[in-house]
Amino acid sequence: MTINEITAISNSFTDEQASTSVVRYYVNECISKVNIEAKAKLPLFSSINDPTYTALSESWQNVLFVPYVCYSIKMNDGSLNEADRYITKFNENLAKLLQEKNSAIGESYREEDFTAIYRTDPTMGINVGWFTRRGNGGF
């Protein structure tokens, strides 16, 4: 998709007239959020005249970029209830992307720790009820 296409779809959904330069900013913010959450390095749009975006499939662009842009447009005009619906949809779709990120995001767009698994020690957080640390070994 191009910025012009994303702008047209988003304006149609929101019944607003956001400019392509504003939409480019919103799309880049969306891509940055995806990059942070997925440990990816998807490229940003550098101008409104950039060619068709190919780092994600058009399906993923439709379910991520469009709801996020619609959310941003509605936040800008103060329609908080509508904005909330769009951000909920974006978050649901982002969660799906994160579950399927190995097939959705190409290897050339992955950070070093893209598939890292972090282990935690759950015993370090026990400090409630019977397990309260009272200086007597937890008893």
PLM features per residue range, with description:
Residues 63-75:
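Short, hydrophobic/amphipathic alpha-helical patches that form generic packing surfaces
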Residues 84-98:
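Short secondary-structure subsegments characteristic of cysteine-rich extracellular domains
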Residues 43-46, 82-87:
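Short, glycine/acidic-rich hinge or "gate" loops at secondary-structure transitions
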